Amino acid sequence: SGELVAFDQRFESAGTQRMFAYGGPVIGAIEGGKLLVIDELDRSLHPLLARFIVRLMHNPAVSTKAAQLWITTHDTTLLDTDLLRRDQIWFVEKEEHQASRLYPLSDFKPRKSEALEWGYLKGRYGGIPFVSEPRFDGSR
């Protein structure tokens, strides 16, 4: 019908609210050529929207002042060399006494054709949680 209808933002999904919350900081970083740091970019955000933000920040036609984006994420779909260079992808791994170690994907020298998401989920690059399978037979 072409009629505009207003919605109260609190009735929007968590992902929609998060996308609106990122709008100002993303635009500010792009316009000012600044660094934008987002912890857990993927929290309540659809993977395609996370990719959109990364692509937007890396698009030289949009980000003409060399804005930078640093994110933490659990979204393995972002492990994509069409989206990020290998030297832009870093992992964090817990060490003894709960210290965290940060290291780049480029340390592993993956082939250009390598499926990074698959390699990460298989443990090739580390940075994955150690989870034991639950036992339901009463044994430990």
Where are the predicted features?
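Conserved ABC ATPase signature
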Residues: 1-27, 41-47
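Conserved active-site beta-strand-loop modules that form the wall/rim of enzyme catalytic pockets
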Residues: 18-19, 33-34, 68
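Short basic/glycine-enriched coil/helix segment immediately N-terminal to the Walker B
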Residues: 26-34
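Catalytic Walker B motif of ABC-type/P-loop ATPase nucleotide-binding domains
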Residues: 36-39
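C-terminal lobe/lid and adjacent interdomain/linker elements of RecA-like ASCE P-loop ATPase modules
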Residues: 51-140
